[in-house]
Amino acid sequence: MDIGVDLIWGDDSESEVFAQAQSKDLSLIFRYSLNLKLPQSLSSRVVNCYYNLSPKDASETFSDRAAMREALYSSVCRVWDQCAMHPSISAPDVTVEIYEDAERQDQWRISHESLYKQYVESLLPISSLFQSGEAKLQAYYTVDYSSLVQIGHLGGRGRTAVVRCSSGSGSLHVFKGVDFGTFLESRADFEHRKDVCYHEIRTISSLPRHPNIIHPADVFATVQKIEDDRQAFVCGTLYPFMEHGTLDDQVKNTKTTGARLALRNKAIWCFQMASAIAHTHFTAHTFHMDIKPANFVLDSNQNLILIDWEQSGAPLYTLAPEANGSWDVKEAKVESSSSDGADSAVSKLVYERYAGHYRENLAWGRPKWNVYPFWSEFYPRALVAAEVFSLGRTMWMLLQQVAQSEVEDLDEVVVYWSEDARDIPDDWKAVVDRCLDPDPNKRIGLMDLLNFWEKVKCKDWTNSMCNPDFSGRSLSLRVAA
């Protein structure tokens, strides 16, 4: 019996823990509730350990999270066969509560959650999702969320998981959205994640097409009301699964092999990153905000595709320092002398540290004060400079081969070029350093950056000493029990 438990979460009350498990074509949500009358029961011990509560006795919790997960997994395996035969087990509003009776024997019961109705009613039908704005609905079809077989979760906000359709060809897709489990976890968090999900769908649909930017989804995952299934409500989208993973996956693969990624590939990928961001600013007239190696996936031809258009947070390890919410910007005219001696006025970005009351417009992400929308409308030059910095950090991580896990928890990222990067040409290092200049006015322009990489990628690599072949490996999907 192959049962996977790859997602465990709590709720706002800190009195319940949920676990999503799957086997073959069946995916179930299990519930563990705190029972004050049976503090040593499995469910109470799971809750106490998950929330790091302080019970009266050590027998009312587990020694650590690993022991808790093992006990939880074992309990799911013990009741799975019985649960799977229940006639209502596949209903979308069902959860399975696992508990112990007075004799400490495993018991389970099916619950049809009344909250499921609230979950569905909080979602939008496709027609309402595209009622206004620049987003345009292309040809599409829908898939019932309950028909999706969970293969493994990919992390990130909301629910992002590798799935396949139970009635389809078996091909893998990536589901990105908000499922019922998200609603059970936190109502407030769900509302935010739902808004972000819909914002991303609309944003991608409004972008002019570009070969290195993800195309609008043409498959929507939907749910229906239990009592009336005539109308479908959007809970997410399906995108093709990219088996080569992300740019960060390619770098992480080299950590085990000790190999250097081919220079030609690095040049092409740097060009494609710059091209996608230039299109974002100068053609689509918007921004990305979350530029990092993990948000560039590789398609079947090893070309980069920019994903994650939530525009609701930025990673601190690629975020431009002036865009961290502590600075305001304005443009000022300054005198400049040309080569012929004539004076002229040029525009310069002037930054001033904010000294007012605490401000916050990004409650669920970081930085807490998001300057991107305001700068996009009133100071686009400052926004472009900030995203050039993020591109520079991302390019450095690729060229130096630094995995995100090496920098994502650091208070400060120090850019360096080690002996391992001796294969990187000096002019490549120099252009990255120009992206990272502390003064945004001195950073290389985005179009100049694009032109640099276009020339590099078009060079004759025939006599190059580097291996010109694709050296990354396919993504190995890891599902934690």
What do these predicted regions represent?
Residues 2-5, 36-156:
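Juxta-kinase regulatory segment immediately upstream of eukaryotic protein kinase catalytic domains
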Residues 303-305, 310-419:
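C-lobe/activation-segment region of protein kinase-like
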Residues 215-264:
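Conserved structural core of kinase catalytic domains
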Residues 436-449:
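A conserved short helix/loop substructure at the end of the activation segment
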Residues 280-299:
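Catalytic-loop of the protein kinase fold
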Residues 423-437:
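Conserved C-terminal C-lobe helix
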Residues 146-207, 211-214:
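ATP-binding glycine-rich loop module of kinase domains
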Residues 269-270:
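Activation segment signature within eukaryotic-like protein kinase domains
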